[in-house]
């Protein structure tokens, strides 16, 4: 017993039109003779088309369900149900999605194509120092790129020569070939898909409308740029082919590590060495800042090693903003290794008078334990 139309498409009798179409497209792609070498592909493909031709039509489907498979076919053979044997799917409606997937892209437009091709984007890695990132800077860079031909002005044709429309494809850039139910498009062999013919190509660019050379360009790096920032320079990439638009240039910023500062977003961190005397007594010391020069930093009396002191608005600038980050100083208390006789005497006297240096009472051990908390 032969399969009925529902079985051929692999759907139930209650399948919706959307389910029918989905099943049909899947099977049509699988069994189309151009996509498989299976011996029975052509036969299966005809069965699939015949089944879908009936089931996609609500009136035919109702008759098919009422009469059954064999009776419906007998009626069709007597001419009672129309001529579905010559069924030709609407290529734009039924197979639009199929062609998009199977042919690797969307269907081509019937409008003439342009021979102009946009140029490629370029990437340039630029390394700057932290001060340059803070202030902003103009940098001159050099790179190899395709540039618009100054002889033919990008047309690809010798000066005074005209570009003619391809007579093989009428300027479309593609030719069509009918294969059964399908219309296949391919690039025109005469114009290579350009849509026009350059009879006398420019000798300097060999008809491409561009050639390669070393370029020099001044690029602006804004103040507050961060490591890893990508800056786009529109139209500074490679020139297009035969007058097409130029691509873009992307400058990727790398900031070199600094000898003093570590960057944390807009904040700067630095280690600040101070004497144990300044740590104990407090005072003011000068510290360098990223914009140049120095500022005074107040050291509170009793400052401990590892304490962090903040200088507000002395960090990095922010792009397109007047707000700055902070500078955070991490205190490193230095203990002198070489003492003069007088310094030693004073420290010995301080030691005797200190009541917090008694190592035998409980307070010393409590301090030791607190260092772990």
UniProtKB/Swiss-Prot annotation:
It is found in: Cytoplasm. Its main location: cytoplasm. Binds 2 Zn(2+) ions per monomer. Its cofactor is Zn(2+). CXXCXGXG motif repeats lie at residues 149-156, 166-173, 188-195, 202-209. GO terms for biological process: chaperone cofactor-dependent protein refolding; DNA replication; protein refolding; response to heat. Keywords: Chaperone, Cytoplasm, DNA replication, Metal-binding, Repeat, Stress response, Zinc, Zinc-finger. The keyword Chaperone applies. One of its GO terms (molecular function) is unfolded protein binding. The keyword Repeat applies. Coiled coil: none annotated. GO terms for cellular component: cytoplasm. Zn(2+) 1 binds at residues 149, 152, 202, 205. InterPro entries: DnaJ, DnaJ_C, DnaJ_domain, DnaJ_domain_CS, HSP40/DnaJ_pept-bd, HSP_DnaJ_Cys-rich_dom, HSP_DnaJ_Cys-rich_dom_sf, J_dom_sf. A zinc finger (CR-type) spans 136-214. Residues 4-68 form the J domain. PROSITE patterns: DNAJ_1, DNAJ_2, ZF_CR. Zn(2+) 2 binds at residues 166, 169, 188, 191. Participates actively in the response to hyperosmotic and heat shock by preventing the aggregation of stress-denatured proteins and by disaggregating proteins, also in an autonomous, DnaK-independent fashion. Unfolded proteins bind initially to DnaJ; upon interaction with the DnaJ-bound protein, DnaK hydrolyzes its bound ATP, resulting in the formation of a stable complex. GrpE releases ADP from DnaK; ATP binding to DnaK triggers the release of the substrate protein, thus completing the reaction cycle. Belongs to the DnaJ family. PANTHER family: DNAJ HOMOLOG 1, MITOCHONDRIAL-RELATED. HAMAP family: DnaJ (MF_01152). The J domain is necessary and sufficient to stimulate DnaK ATPase activity. Zinc center 1 plays an important role in the autonomous, DnaK-independent chaperone activity of DnaJ. Zinc center 2 is essential for interaction with DnaK and for DnaJ activity. Homodimer. This is Chaperone protein DnaJ. It comes from Rickettsia africae (strain ESF-5).
């Amino acid at each position: 017993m032969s399969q009925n139309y529902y079985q051929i498409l692999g759907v139930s009798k209650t399948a919706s039109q959307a389910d029918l179409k989905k099943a049909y497209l899947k099977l049509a792609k699988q069994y189309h003779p151009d996509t498989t070498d299976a011996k029975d592909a052509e036969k299966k493909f005809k069965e699939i088309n015949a089944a879908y031709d009936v089931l996609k039509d609500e009136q035919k489907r109702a008759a098919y369900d009422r009469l059954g498979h064999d009776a419906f076919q007998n009626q069709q053979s007597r001419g009672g149900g129309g001529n579905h044997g010559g069924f030709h799917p609407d290529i734009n409606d039924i197979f639009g999605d199929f062609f998009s997937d199977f042919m690797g892209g969307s269907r081509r437009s019937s409008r003439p194509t342009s021979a102009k091709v946009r140029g490629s984007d370029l990437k340039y890695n630029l390394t700057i120092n932290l001060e340059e990132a803070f202030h902003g800077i103009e940098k001159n860079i050099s790179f190899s790129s395709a540039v618009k031909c100054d002889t033919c002005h990008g047309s690809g044709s010798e000066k005074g020569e005209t570009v003619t429309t391809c007579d093989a494809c009428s300027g479309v850039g593609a030719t069509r070939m009918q294969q059964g139910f399908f219309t296949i498009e391919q690039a025109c062999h005469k114009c290579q898909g350009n849509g026009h013919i350059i009879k006398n190509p420019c000798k300097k660019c060999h008809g491409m409308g561009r050639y390669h050379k070393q370029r020099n360009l001044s690029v602006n790096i804004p103040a507050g740029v961060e490591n890893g920032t990508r800056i786009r320079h529109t139209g500074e990439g490679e020139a297009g082919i035969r007058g097409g638009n130029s691509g873009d240039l992307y400058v990727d910023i790398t900031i070199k590590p600094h000898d003093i500062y570590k960057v944390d977003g807009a904040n700067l961190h630095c280690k600040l060495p101070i004497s144990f005397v300044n740590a104990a007594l407090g005072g003011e010391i000068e510290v360098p800042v990223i914009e140049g020069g120095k500022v005074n930093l107040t050291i509170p009396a009793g400052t401990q090693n590892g304490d962090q002191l903040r200088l507000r608005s002395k960090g990095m600038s922010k792009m397109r903003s007047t707000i700055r980050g902070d500078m955070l100083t991490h205190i490193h208390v230095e203990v002198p290794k070489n003492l003069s006789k007088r310094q030693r005497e004073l420290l010995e006297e301080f030691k005797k008078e200190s009541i917090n240096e008694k190592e035998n009472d409980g307070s010393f051990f409590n301090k030791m334990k607190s260092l772990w908390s």
